[in-house]
Amino acid sequence: MISAIIEDIKAIKRNDPAARGLEVILYPTLHAMLFHRFICHPLYKIRLFFLARFFSQLSRFLTGLEIHPGAKIGPGFFCDHGMGVVIGETAVIGRNCVMFHGVTLGGTGKHKRKRHPTVGDNCFIGTHSTLLGPIRVGNGVKIGAESVIVNRDVPDHCTVVGAPAMIVKRGQRKVHPPEPLPFSSYRLDEVKRELGMVIEPDMVSDGGGI
């Protein structure tokens, strides 16, 4: 946990030219990570859910970042400004990710299994972007401000913008016209499972034929 916090401090210095010295210890993103890494997430893992939520709410009040205790966040996380950020329970964020204020990593549906985004390593998520559902955002992805992604995966090393977001760059190569994002592989598997549950009883009652 200490090594993760050290990486978080390095991320502040690396991504914000205004961070010149000891003032990094005043950044809300660092305070939020201290709460999450040392208190909220450990309490959640040992199933002390009320205490975990209590301290996450305290962190939200002090920092403006709403991070569910169940979220998994890799080292080197930096959230500039931070106000209005929402990170859901089953969200996963990789190493060295940067996001700005107003970003939502939200869920779809009311089931208790995976329902929030998984974000890869070295990603950038711009101001007021909304990512919903059990989607996969690949490594090295850049998401432009106010983009909206619902139940769509983002391939590695792509730049996406818009509502709905579309691919405008793959690596260093511009994409014209912009390409739509592929449907969420997790959601497709979920639909297949649900279809299987519907079809299977019929197959049994009909003697196996469709």
What are these regions, as identified by a protein language model?
Residues M1-S59, T63, K174-I210:
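Terminal amphipathic alpha-helical/low-complexity segments used for targeting or macromolecular assembly
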Residues R60-V161, A165-V168:
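Structural signal for interior beta-strand "rungs" in well-ordered beta-sheet cores
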